[in-house]
Amino acid sequence: MSDNLSASQEKTPHERMQARLTVAALVQWQGRFLVVEEEIKGQRRFNQPAGHVEAGEDLLTAACRELKEETGLTATPTSWLGTYLYKPADSEATYVRTAIIFDLEKAPGQHHPEDPDGDILACHWLTLEEIAECKPALRSPLVWQCIEDYLAGTRLPLSALKAFIQS
């Protein structure tokens, strides 16, 4: 350490966060929310249909793909709910999750997930109360936060999501 710098002023290298870019689909139908039941590290977890953005995808395309893969549903994205940063205490990973609100054009039927990752156990339409009962088994606090934001009326325009993907 230089004689001119105190211990609190000593320059230290900044560690850069390595974020994992993910999307989630929030779908509500007649007072029930669509959740997927997954197996993560041998434990049952509940989540919105969600996953990683793949190379070359924009956020809306990724959210539509994840919804289709995990539930078999095709729906219309209507609003951007928000973007959330999550750093679990038990992991080195940091997640940046963009949540998109989808509207169903007709009543949901049977779910036939494509599930290329093989971790979806089932799809459920749960009330807020049922999700609250599952809180300890939610995949992350983002699941509940997205529902709270949705119920609070948060709606951002999809046109605010910009993508500049160069090949």
Predicted regions and their residues:
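Short connector loops at helix/strand junctions that flank enzyme active sites
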Residues: 20, 28, 48, 75, ...
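Conserved Nudix-box catalytic region and its N-terminal flanking loop in Nudix hydrolases
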Residues: 29-69
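Unchanged
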Residues: 53-76, 86-139
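Acidic, metal-coordinating catalytic segment for phosphate/diphosphate chemistry
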Residues: 1-24
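Nudix hydrolase/Nudix homology domain
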Residues: 43-46, 117-167
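Conserved beta-strand and immediately adjacent loop positions that scaffold enzyme active sites
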Residues: 24, 32, 122
